Amino acid sequence: MSEPNQQPYMRVDDLHEHAASSSDAPKKKKKRGKWLAFFVAIGILVVCAAIAGGQFFGDTAHDGPFASGEKNVVMIDVKGEITAEGDTYNQQFILNQINEAKNDSDNKAILLMLDTPGGSVYECDEVYNKLLEYKKETKRPIYAYCESMCASAGYYIASTADAIYANRNSLVGSIGVITGQFVDATQLLDDLGVKITTVHSGANKLMGAMYEAPTEEQIAIMQSISDEYYAQFVGVVADGRGMTTEQVKALADGRIYSASQAKGNGLIDAIGTIDDMDKHIKKDVGENVRFYHEVYEQSPYASLLGGLKSAIDSRSMSSELASSVKTIEEMNITEPMYLYQP
């Protein structure tokens, strides 16, 4: 925020300086309040306009058949961190695309285009099951192409494919789970003079809170959950790749593999370009197919609203404190994640 304009000339008088500085403070407060009200008003207008136009959540696929009238292969992007909604990933958009392909009698296959470090266990398993439903009900194949990265939850989803290709520079794998990454911010809060008291019942109700150091019991609880989701991941890969659980566990220590290593270990079928993948698909389903590719784009209204929120938040605390809080929030993981996190 810019400072109020100063008078070009001032009398060097202690009393006058004191009076000027005293009257300056409420002006600053008043001006800050006006700016905050302005941002809030703009935000409300943006939300109202976006909802009225049906564009708040970004472009989404229609939950019905493409009705394309020609044989097609639907290309579905799985890009960015897998979560409910992000700049490049939208869960409902992907689920709707799968439904569209399933309901289109002219559809011949799905091609997954993967470039992701992974993400939420819930979202990736939901996509995984929706793809299995597509295969079961249509008897059509699924293919997967790994671009620069196909890690963790991304590879979990790719395991549904009948054939997995990867770019020669792709990183593949990271079969593992992060269930708890506790950030103990108690010392930071003490340094800031912040005291938090939460009234609760249940010894582990505050498990994962940044203002409570985790106990040994809580770490053991999260480890048991982590082991359960790890076993689920191993089972998914074993089913998809025709391997035993022992074979998968030998590879599933969380590490990432190069494309050549992944192929050597049976995690992918071939290394090649997207053109090579296309040729493979056409050989399976026929030459006369059109590749249908619908790209998700986040609504500009949602992006603008996010920018306004950030601007308001940054005005309410120092930039250094805001940066520290954001970093701590990103580090704290209290839900199961199939995520490659170097």
Identify the meaning behind each predicted range.
Residues M1-P141, M149-C150, A163-A166, Q181-P342:
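N-terminal organellar transit peptides
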Residues G154:
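Pocket-flanking alpha-helical
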Residues A161-T179:
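Zinc-dependent metallopeptidase catalytic helix centered on the HExxH motif
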